[in-house]
Structures are given as structure tokens and as C-alpha cells.
Amino acid sequence: MNQTIRKILIPTGVYLLLIVVVNSCDYGICKDVDYYDFSEVKIQIKNSNTIESQDSLIFKIKQLDTRYMAQKRIEFNFIKSTYALNCDYGWNGMKIPLTKIEISSNSDFNEDHPANTSLNDIIIVKILEDPNKFHSEYHFEKFNSVEFEKLLPRKDFLNPDFYIAEQPTMELTHRLTVKIFKSNGDIIVAESEGIFWN
């Protein structure tokens, strides 16, 4: 008899606990995870570091330390890892908005783009229509016309691909530098490995 009651009570208890966890966002546990932030990025070259003449350079900018604003308030790892499945982390955008993203090379790219000047105007972005939706469609857009938060969305696996379709006409070996400017004055800088155009 006791074993039968136990078999009923344990699954019922687990079920009720899951209901509480799934609905936890509505009761304020997740109310402070509206925003996200990061302070470090890397440049990931998607094709090899040697670019053939018929190919475009393709790369990603990836956040290395994305943080959501309320994680410090939750002391229990079990609760934190469980409600993370349901809470919509960072849905309201960056806590400290971005004001500018600049991509440059350490070498002369062509006559219009000498070393350490912006290459933004020759970069095309393959981006989701809505980076916050998993089933969103991709499209191509000029770098300078894309909102900053779409370039670095709250989930880094949704980050777009960046294309430099033009070939350099000056130096053949380049290191890209990405500078990300925040509204609080912080600047995040990342540099790629050497890239060589054949």
C-alpha cells in the first residue's frame, strides 16, 4: 500500500515542481534577465586563412562572455539551470547599447582603403530577418545598414556571416581588427590571424 502511494506521490510531486519552474518567469524569477552584455569577442575566419582569387573572405564576430543581467541573484544552480530553459534571456537588447562597430585591416587593402581605415563599406552581411527567431530566413544586407544588435545578437550561434567580396589590390597579407564601441565609452577590440589572398 505504502509503495503504491509513493509511486503516485513522487511523479505527482515532480510534475508539480515542473509546473512551478515552467511558470517561474511569470512570477518574477526571470524578470531581470531582460538584457545582455559582453566585454570580449573574437574573429572567426570561416574559410581558410588563404583566400583564393575567386572566393570571398567569410568571417564571424563571436561574443566570448555573454552575460544576462539577473544571474547573480539566483543562488541555487539547480533552479538557475532549470529556469534557463524557459526564460527569454536578453530579449530586451543590450544593457549598454553599441554606438559603432568598425572593421579595418592592418595593411593597405586598396587605394580607397589604406591600412587601419574602415572596411565597413565593402562588407556584406548574411543575416537572419529576425535573429531572435529560430526559423527566421537569411538575407544579404550591406554592413552599414544593419542594426548593431542584429550583428551581435543575444545568442551567439545566431550571429551573421560577414563577407568581404572584394580582393585586395595592395598588400596580400592582412590582419582584420574589429572595434566595438559602447555607449558607456568602453571599446572592445579583437584581431584576426593573418589572412593571405592568392
Segments from the language model and where they lie:
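Bacterial Sec-dependent N-terminal signal peptides
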Residues: 1-35
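Non-catalytic macromolecular-recognition regions in eukaryotic signaling proteins
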Residues: 25-198
